[in-house]
Each structure stands twice: as C-alpha cells, then as structure tokens.
C-alpha cells in the first residue's frame, strides 16, 4: 500500500497576482528600520509644496512693483447725489416707506437705504426695478 501516509508535493506553491508593496507601505517606520538593519540604501525626499496651492497663491510677488508704482486712487463709483435725491423724492411722492419700496422690487430694505444714503454701487438692474416701481425716470437725461 503505497498510498498510506502523509501526502507530499514535489513542487513549490506559487502565489498569483500578489500586489507589490505600495509607496505608503514602503515609507512606514517598520520597513525603513528593517532596511537600515539590512544595510540597504535609504533615500528620504520631501516633496516641495506637496498638498498645497502655494504656487497659485504666490501671485502677489509678481505684480508688487506695478502695485507700488500705481498711485491712482481706486474706488468704486457710488450713487450720485442727484440720483439719491430723485429716489427719495419719487418714493415720498408715492407715500412709500423704504421697506415697502424694497418689498415691491424684491430687494432688502438695506439696499434702498444704501441707495438713498449714497453708499451703494449703482446696479442697472436695481435702478430699472426702482424706475418701474416708482414710475419715474432715474437714469439718463430727464
């Protein structure tokens, strides 16, 4: 009876498709220490600006000289005095409060306050809404 006893194989087991260690696994402390003990060469490289967007945000250094040379006063155009007076006059003629006018044109009351105080930056859409709601021409020649 030749078949009795432990079964033995005469070939080596082969593992198919075992993934090689990825870069993160090669960087861990255990692997690095094992490489040091075995005397293998270890190269440590830190990536420059990795995970940041410093290259895109460092644009201030490019135009610094131009900004320093520029002495022009850069401000937004505000509502002219005639326009804010015209808005106030038309609103009071219609006997509307600022909040009522804001509700009619679907804007916040703060927008009307800014226009009437002259702090707002003129917006053509809002001005056209005001013209329609107040029935008065606010832009252009009168």
Curated annotation (Swiss-Prot):
UniProt region (Disordered), positions on chain: 51-77
Up-regulation conditions: Not induced by heat or cold treatments, H(2)O(2), dehydration, abscisic acid, 2,4-D, ACC, methyl jasmonate or salicylic acid. Weak induction by salt stress and pathogen induction.
HTH cro/C1-type domain boundaries: 87-141
Biological process annotations from GO: positive regulation of DNA-templated transcription
Tissue: Expressed in leaves, roots, stems, flowers, siliques and shoots. Detected only in anthers and some seeds in siliques.
Pfam families in UniProt: HTH_3, MBF1
PROSITE patterns (UniProt xref): HTH_CROC1
Biased amino acid composition, Polar residues: 51-64
Protein's UniProt keywords contain Lyase: no
Annotated SMART domains: HTH_XRE
Coiled coil ranges: none
GO CC annotations on file: cytosol; nucleolus
GO MF annotation, one: mRNA binding
Alphabetized UniProt keyword annotations: Activator, DNA-binding, Nucleus, Transcription, Transcription regulation
DNA-binding region(s) in UniProt: 98-117
Subcellular locations according to the entry: Nucleus, Nucleolus
InterPro entries xref list: Cro/C1-type_HTH, Lambda_DNA-bd_dom_sf, MBF1_N
Predominant place of localization: nucleus
Gene3D superfamilies, alphabetized: lambda repressor-like DNA-binding domains
Domain notes: The C-terminal domain (75-142) is essential for nucleolar localization.
Similarity annotation: Belongs to the MBF1 family.
PANTHER family named in the record: ENDOTHELIAL DIFFERENTIATION-RELATED FACTOR 1 MULTIPROTEIN BRIDGING FACTOR 1, MULTIPROTEIN-BRIDGING FACTOR 1A
Function: Transcriptional coactivator that stimulates transcriptional activity by bridging regulatory proteins and TBP, thereby recruiting TBP to promoters occupied by DNA-binding regulators.
Protein name as it appears in the record: Multiprotein-bridging factor 1a
UniProt lineage: Eukaryota, Viridiplantae, Streptophyta, Embryophyta, Tracheophyta
